[in-house]
């Protein structure tokens, strides 16, 4: 789970605390060659304060220290706020890739769907 991921990638992830609450977080790691930002989020009431950018800079610096040269992330196409953010801070949308999923354990996915 998340604990194992954090243990494999020490010092890479970040949680922003504002007013004693978690305002945002990034789960960050790498495979030795490419870094990846997972589950990037900033609570709506804390957006437009530079928190997201500061967290990205933290993660990018941690990856640079680990000699990682490229970083990727996945953003849903319908996430207009997130996609505008990535474009605004200079990330490039790749047009040359297709993204594929294969579900190994449906229970693992649906148990988090708390609708």
Model feature map: region roles:
Residues 1-39, 58, 62, 66, ...:
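Acetyl-CoA-dependent GNAT
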Residues 30, 43-49, 77-78:
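Active-site acidic-Proline motif in GNAT/NAT acetyltransferases
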Residues 39-42, 48-61, 84, 88:
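Conserved acetyl-CoA-binding loop-helix of GNAT-fold acetyltransferases
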Residues 56, 63-76:
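Conserved GNAT acetyl-CoA-binding A-motif
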Residues 73-82, 101-104:
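Conserved beta-strand-loop-alpha-helix junction that forms the acyl-donor binding cleft
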Residues 87-96:
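Conserved acetyl-CoA-binding loop of GNAT-fold acetyltransferases
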Residues 87-88, 109-111:
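Short low-complexity, flexible loop/linker segments enriched in glycine and/or proline
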